[in-house]
Amino acid sequence: MRIAKIANTRGVDSDARKHHHAGWMLLGCMVISVFLCYGQIRNSKALLAVCLLAFLGFVVLSCGRNAVFAVLLYFLPWSPLLRLDNKSVSFFTIALLAVCLVYCLKDHLSFNTYQSVLAFFLVLLTLAAKLWQGNPIRNNYLFFVCMLFLLPSVVEKSNAVSFKEATLFFAAGVVMAALIAQQTAGLPNISKYINVQSYLSITRRSGFYGDPNFYAAHITACLAGVQLLLSREEKRVHQLALLALMVLLIYCGLLSASKSFVLTTAGLFLAWVPILLEKGHRTSKFRLLLGIMCAGAVIVSSSAFEPLFEVIDERFSYAANISQLTTKRTDLWMDYLNEFAHNVSLTLLGHGYTSVTLHGWASHNTIIQSVYQFGLLGAPLLFIWVALTLKRVRQGLKDSRSNWRYTLLMLVGVVIPWIALDILFFDEFFLLPVYVVLGSHYSKE
């Protein structure tokens, strides 16, 4: 009995130390992001250089504390500001590559055979496509190739990742970036990073991103994670804190006036129902349902949400047909499909991962973008590579059993918005699928 008590005490002390370290890591992230924003406002190259170096050092430091995934998710909404000017490469991309190199060096450059072979053939296909289409090799392509070879070595360490910690860091980063961007969007040195769309009586915020839908996709991904934490939380104080966080995320999402955010959020709450109906502690479940109803009442009745609902209502009022509902995305999709039907070489090989678009317009659909960039020969190789990478994530977890309800919720929050986005050129393509797998295997930590 005494041994059991000692073991239990040690476990509690260990958890307390982990939470203590996580708290300091989160505080460090917040301090860096605040000074980063101030440096951009003042256009101080010296301060920006210090912040960017501090960011890189902080990310490398977090590798040794098994908190790198959480730290990267925190800074994901800040990535547009993580650069010396709006034309240079984001240091977030550099940090992601640095993390992969650190872990690969720890493993003495060991590579997975199957994924390396897939990556090799994908590189050959893209180089052939570039040669055929006359497209140059640029830095974003080199980064993509490096990630194809290096990322599989990193995801094997996912057993040390805390989904709860990652979600809370992600939420803190999203909320801070959204609210600070809302207040600083009019400043000249910040406005060059932000695209605030205003027409008629509609104003659309996008955090520090140039696309409101891209910004909203971060929020739906994070919201799915918070809902998952809520469904497993039994402590009253923690439930209240998570409910407040959920309300904040919905507020930040509505700032985008994004129709896809509204539809995805509705899908999230529908996918949440089977999880809430799972067997569990009745008192805790009842308290949670009561809290959700109270949160809904706050959202509906709050004066802070009223103008946001008016903007959303006005946006939907213009949607007389499917083309207007999707903001002419369906027209773009038909243009791309028509191009595939008349251009055999493009359909088979693609453009070889370039910034080339059809008539200067992006496809606004990740699947169409995959075919346009990699062709029907390369796109399946890419999807198989992703599937094998996520399989390695799953195998590295303590509990390899997934919950289909959790998987559905995470897929709705993360993947559904990609139907209206071109995600392949962004760091989210490598990070967020891992987040989905971590959520689908989440158990009370």
Please describe what each predicted stretch is:
Residues 2-103, 128-129, 414-416:
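N-terminal signal-anchor transmembrane segment
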Residues 36-46, 82-91, 132-143, 209-216, ...:
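Helix-loop-helix junctions and helix-breaking kinks within/between transmembrane helices
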Residues 29-35, 270, 407-417, 423-445:
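Transmembrane alpha-helices of multi-pass inner-membrane enzymes
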Residues 54-59, 95-111, 118-182, 273, ...:
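Transmembrane alpha-helical segments and their membrane-water interfaces
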Residues 199-205, 284-288, 299-334, 355-358:
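Flexible juxtamembrane loops connecting transmembrane helices in multi-pass membrane enzymes
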Residues 273, 376-415:
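Hydrophobic transmembrane alpha-helices and their immediate junctions
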Residues 54, 126, 164-193, 209-275, ...:
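Alpha-helical transmembrane segments of multi-pass inner-membrane proteins
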Residues 318-377, 393-398:
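Long extracytoplasmic/lumenal interhelical loops at the membrane interface
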